[in-house]
A protein has these predicted regions:
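Histidine-anchored nucleotide/phosphate-binding helix
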Residues: 27-48, 52, 239-248
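Short internal beta-strands
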Residues: 48-59, 80, 180, 254-260, ...
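A glycine-rich helix N-cap at a beta->alpha junction
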Residues: 67-89, 278-293, 302
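C-terminal non-catalytic interaction/assembly regions of soluble proteins
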Residues: 238-356
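Glycine-rich phosphate/diphosphate-binding loops that line cofactor/substrate pockets in enzymes
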Residues: 4-22, 43-48, 213-221, 248-250, ...
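Conserved, well-structured core segments that form the ligand-binding/active-site neighborhood
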Residues: 76-218
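Short glycine-rich or small-residue beta-strand-to-loop segments that form or flank ligand, phosphate
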Residues: 17-28, 52-57, 223-225
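Structural motif
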Residues: 20-22, 114-116, 221-225, 256, ...
């Protein structure tokens, strides 16, 4: 299919153009999506050696993508963004409120920047608008911390500022063509859209609603599953799953988060061992850690209900922060017998609660 409100790729890339493909966090089917896009470049006048794929985090997903690209396109470059490496960052401009916009240097220097991102919705924690997944993911550590603080703001000012910064960054980078991957409720791909501007945003939002909308139904027990890969991006998925579950659970009920996360509790989350919520919240905000968002959401959630994790994490660490631990599905099944009603949310990090 042709891009939405945009010319074919062959008419927008020219000989000598350097191309940066910015891969956002937790894009389902990312290997296949990137390979498909690179194959489209074979029909253009661009040299494959002038294309670099940039990912926001290192880890298993990044390694698999690098191998997939190398097996098909040996001359295509691959880079893992480092928010702490000043040499790998470039000053783009100042934001509307005067904050410096520092962005990955490869993106800044490229003639053509094409982001590949997961479509998210307005109710998600940290949603940054149509170009969600561009920054703070590909910015410096200071910007990432500033965005975390804005996400935790209680009013709408933080969200407006974040989205404004992201839009401005996309404009300054000269981004025209974008690829949006619409997830389904079980972590797969519902559809893939490409194009430019508001028409792409509208189409992507409509596709996401069709794929992930759920009518809210209150229950004393909510079981929320989240997929994805362990890493900095996965903490945001956990936070979104917890946030979605909070809209379905009854007061003083129980939320069980099912995750494939197999690592120790993060630095920010450890501060939840402080039972004084105000003190814990302050320490979390000062931590500047990737798990800051999930820590703040768990702090909010524990004031509403009891929380259990069923994951590969350590039981002692979870219990220290006031979270119950379910070793396997059988323990969850036993928990279900204690309640007369249960809501199960598959892909809770992507669920869109809507009124029936």
């Amino acid at each position: 299919a042709s891009p939405i409100d945009f010319v074919p790729l062959s008419q927008s890339v020219f000989p000598g153009d350097t191309v940066a493909i910015a891969v956002g966090p937790e894009v389902p089917g990312i290997n296949e999506v990137v390979i498909a896009l690179l194959k489209c470049f074979e029909d253009t006048q661009a040299s494959m050696a002038d294309i670099t794929v940039v990912v926001p985090y290192d880890g298993e997903t990044a390694g698999q993508l690098k191998e997939a690209i190398a097996s098909e396109f040996s001359s295509v470059g691959f880079q893992v963004h480092d928010a702490h490496d000043d040499e790998a960052l470039a000053y783009l401009a100042a934001s509307a409120v005067g904050d410096p916009i520092m962005v990955n240097r490869t993106l800044c220097d490229a003639d053509v920047v094409i982001p590949i991102t997961t479509v998210r919705h307005d109710g998600m924690l940290g949603y940054n608008g149509g170009f969600d997944g561009l920054i703070p993911e590909f910015s410096d550590a200071a910007t990432q911390q500033r965005f975390c603080e804005l996400i935790s703001a209680t009013d709408e000012t933080g969200g407006l500022q974040r989205r404004g910064d992201v839009r401005e960054t996309a404009w300054l980078l000269g981004i025209q063509l974008s690829v949006r991957v619409v997830p389904n409720s079980i972590g797969g791909v519902a559809s893939i859209l490409a194009g430019m501007g508001g028409q792409l945003d509208v189409a992507a939002e409509e596709e996401l609603k069709q794929a992930c909308s759920v009518s809210p139904e209150q229950a004393p027990l909510v079981i929320a599953s989240v997929g994805g890969n362990a890493g900095a991006g996965h903490w945001r998925s956990l936070a979104n799953a917890a946030h979605a579950a909070s809209q379905f659970v009854q007061a003083n009920g129980v939320v069980v988060l099912l995750s494939d996360l197999n690592e120790s509790v993060g630095t920010a989350t450890r501060f939840l061992a402080d039972l004084d919520d105000e003190s814990a919240g302050r320490r979390v905000m000062e931590s500047q850690q990737p798990d800051q968002i999930i820590a703040m959401e768990l702090l909010r959630l524990r004031g509403i209900c009891r929380i259990y994790f069923c994951c590969g994490g350590r039981q002692d660490e979870l219990e220290e922060i006031g979270v119950g631990f379910a070793a396997d599905i059988s323990e969850i099944e036993n928990l279900c017998t204690e309640y007369d009603k249960c809501v199960v949310l598959h892909g809770a990090d992507r669920v869109i609660p809507v009124q029936a």
